[in-house]
Curated annotation (Swiss-Prot):
Organism classification: Eukaryota, Viridiplantae, Streptophyta, Embryophyta, Tracheophyta
Domain of life: Eukaryota
Disulphide connectivity of cysteines: none
Protein's name according to its UniProt entry: Putative protein PHLOEM PROTEIN 2-LIKE B4
GO MF annotations in UniProt: carbohydrate binding
Pfam (any one): PP2
Organism of origin: Arabidopsis thaliana
Length: 144
C-alpha cells in the first residue's frame, strides 16, 4: 500500500479479512510484519504463537519469541498483546480480526513509499486447510 495516501499523525490498525470453512486447521504460528526500507531499524516484525485455532475468540499470545525493530520516523505500539478478538461476522459472511497497529507521523510511513503486511507460517510443514483470505484492511483508530 502506498503510504502517501495515509493521513499524517494518525494511528492505524491492520485487520485480516477472512472466512473459514469446514475442517479449518494447520495454523499454529504466524508472523505479522510491517516492513520499511532495508535496515533493521526500518522494520517491525512480531512472531506470535497463536495455537491451532488462532482465529478463535480470545486466544492468548506467548510473547517470548517476539522480535521488534523500531524506526525513528514512526512510533509502533508497544503495549502487551493479551488476546486476539474475532470481530462480528459481516452480513456478507466475512470476518475481520485486528493483527497490528501503527502510527504514521507524517512524510510517509518509515520514509518509504509502501507498507507491506504479511501473515505467514513457514516453520511448520503441516498441511493448511480451510482459510480463505479476502485481504488486509487498514483503518484509522482512535488514539489510546
Amino acid at each position: 500500500m502506498n503510504t502517501q495516501i495515509l493521513s499524517q499523525k494518525t494511528r492505524y490498525s491492520a485487520y485480516i479479512v477472512y472466512k473459514t470453512i469446514y475442517r479449518f486447521h494447520g495454523f499454529k504460528h504466524i508472523g505479522v510484519g510491517f516492513i520499511g526500507h532495508g535496515t533493521p531499524k526500518a522494520k517491525r516484525w512480531e512472531r506470535k504463537d497463536l495455537g491451532n485455532d488462532w482465529l478463535g475468540c480470545k486466544k492468548k499470545f506467548k510473547a517470548s519469541k517476539k522480535q521488534k525493530f523500531y524506526s525513528n520516523k514512526s512510533t509502533f505500539t508497544d503495549k502487551p498483546i493479551t488476546h486476539l478478538i474475532k470481530l462480528e461476522e459481516g452480513e456478507d459472511g466475512w470476518m475481520a480480526t485486528e493483527f497490528g497497529e501503527f502510527f504514521a507521523e507524517g512524510g510517509g510511513l518509515l520514509d518509504c513509499d509502501e507498507i507491506v503486511l504479511s501473515v505467514i507460517d513457514i516453520d511448520y510443514a503441516y498441511w493448511k486447510c480451510g482459510l480463505i483470505i479476502q485481504g488486509i484492511d487498514i483503518r484509522p483508530t482512535k488514539s489510546p
